[in-house]
């Protein structure tokens, strides 16, 4: 099991960045590797389940484990067959204004290492004015 963290800062308000996380229907707008999301929930909450579809044809199932709206933090588990990743996200104020988002990914080392640049690209778009 390996753990890696990536963070990015940008000019959008914390509330905007958080809403982009909190509403699964918006994920494909800022995460370029996500084609669409299937879930019955309009907003993340503990126990919410669904599937994420990538442009590469990969479908992964997910379960939201924890959400703290006040602290703007959430954790979810993503799985594809025997591969499972745990992803922890948070949005904070960036020095000088805007927001900073941080992602901590835990899982098999090769998957975590390969996902890091994709995650960095997505996080940069999350905190950008128009993803």
Residue positions per predicted region:
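Beta-strand/loop substructures that line and gate deep hydrophobic ligand-binding cavities in soluble
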Residues: 77-129
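Generic surface-pattern signal
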Residues: 39, 128-131
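Hydrophobic ligand-binding cavity/cleft-lining segments
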Residues: 1-42
């Amino acid at each position: 099991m390996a753990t890696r963290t990536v963070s990015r800062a940008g000019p959008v308000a914390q509330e905007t960045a958080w809403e982009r996380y909190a509403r699964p229907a918006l994920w494909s707008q800022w995460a370029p590797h996500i084609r669409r999301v299937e879930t019955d929930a309009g907003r993340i909450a503990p126990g919410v389940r669904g599937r994420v579809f990538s442009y590469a044809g990969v479908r992964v199932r997910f379960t939201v484990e924890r959400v703290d709206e006040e602290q703007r933090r959430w954790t979810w588990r993503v799985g594809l067959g025997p591969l499972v990743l745990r992803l922890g996200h948070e949005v904070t104020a960036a020095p000088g204004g805007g927001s900073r988002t941080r992602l901590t990914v835990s899982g098999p080392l090769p998957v975590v290492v390969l996902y890091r640049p994709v995650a960095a690209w997505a996080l940069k778009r999350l905190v950008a004015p128009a993803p």
